Amino acid sequence: MLGSLAKWLRIFGFDTFYPDATTNDDEVLHIAKAENRLLLSRDKELIIRGKKAQLQVLEIQTTDLDTQLAQVLTHILIDHTQVLTRCTLCNTPLISVEKKAIKTHVPPKVFETRDSFWYCSVCHKYYWMGTHYENMIEKINKLTNKNNR
């Protein structure tokens, strides 16, 4: 499964559909075709079926996340204005919220030390620029610099 890759593609700002365990291959192919999506998979049979259906496909070659991301980033470009604009859990675009509106929804230390916040209207999860954010930006920069060499 490519759940970690899907999460990171969302962090990079890509509109990323990740099927749950109940979604079968026929449904995945239908969604990919209907929504004009790039199909990423390690499943050779699904890749073959995607090619036969004339979908854009990319067979992921490894289980290593950084290598997976590097492979994907050789095929699609990051729009840096979209980085960290989607919920990592459900893919919904995040909404910027005013600091005063979230006081009871984030830890007190976060409220005291951070000024910018975002909200997922589907998951009801809050995001802010903390150490996770800084680590993600560092990883994005590392991967994009490596791919631009």
Residue ranges and their predicted role:
Residues 87-90, 120-123:
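Short cysteine-rich clusters marking metal-coordination/redox-active sites
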Residues 92-98, 128:
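Short functional micro-motifs and their immediate structural scaffolds
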Residues 40-41, 119-120, 127-128:
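Short hydrophobic-aromatic micro-motifs
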Residues 83, 121, 145, 149:
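Surface-exposed, charge/polar-rich loops and edge strands
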Residues 80-83, 113-116:
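Short metal-coordination and nucleic-acid-contact micro-motifs, chiefly zinc-binding Cys/His arrays
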Residues 1-82:
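Long, charged N-terminal interaction/targeting segments
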Residues 101-112, 135-146:
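Short cysteine/histidine-rich metal-coordination sites, predominantly Zn2+-binding motifs
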